Amino acid sequence: MAFDYKKEYKEFYMPKGTPSIVTVPKMNYIAVRGSGNPNDADGEYKQAIGLLYGIAFTIKMSKKEDHQIDGYFDYVVPPLEGFWWQDGVSGIDYARKEDFKWISVIRLPDFVTREDFDWAVRKATAKKKQDFSKVELFPYEEGLCVQCMHIGAYDDEPATVDAMHRFMEEHGYTLDITDRRMHHEIYLSDGRRVAPEKLKTVIRHPIKRA
């Protein structure tokens, strides 16, 4: 059976619907950076998702290629994630989607090296006749965070975020959003196929001791 990061690391991907504190270790991702409203039909965000999945599945299917990755094991491609911010705003202003800046990411298995990533970019570029130069290898250690499972529409996230911040303060922490520590979302549902009120999204905010 394929290794499923969501099931093997439930503390990071399947938190409860009440806030909790978690320390997230360093992970490797593939990433595309961009800006603008993620709901724009032909916008940067939609293009970024296509690029990410192109590389993610090239790496997953490398077992069928001449390029064999050392330590490879079969796995389920982890869910899409995003780091979000807006200049001049602490946190997120959901009414100003056009001002979003983001890093869209998908986690990589630890066995994927820089050489393997570079091979995947070359392979996907040749096979799909598409420019994958915006995709980068993105190692990131998130550290101490408060997180919660949000069930519902993306625009209803502020209520969950408020609950997270109250929990954080009650337990002696303060928000630590900076230019390197950002609002983080993990998308466990496909927004194209799931009703807004049933969407499952992990929301995570960086914190520090007050």
Where are these regions (language model features)?
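A solvent-exposed interaction/effector surface
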Residues: M1-A210
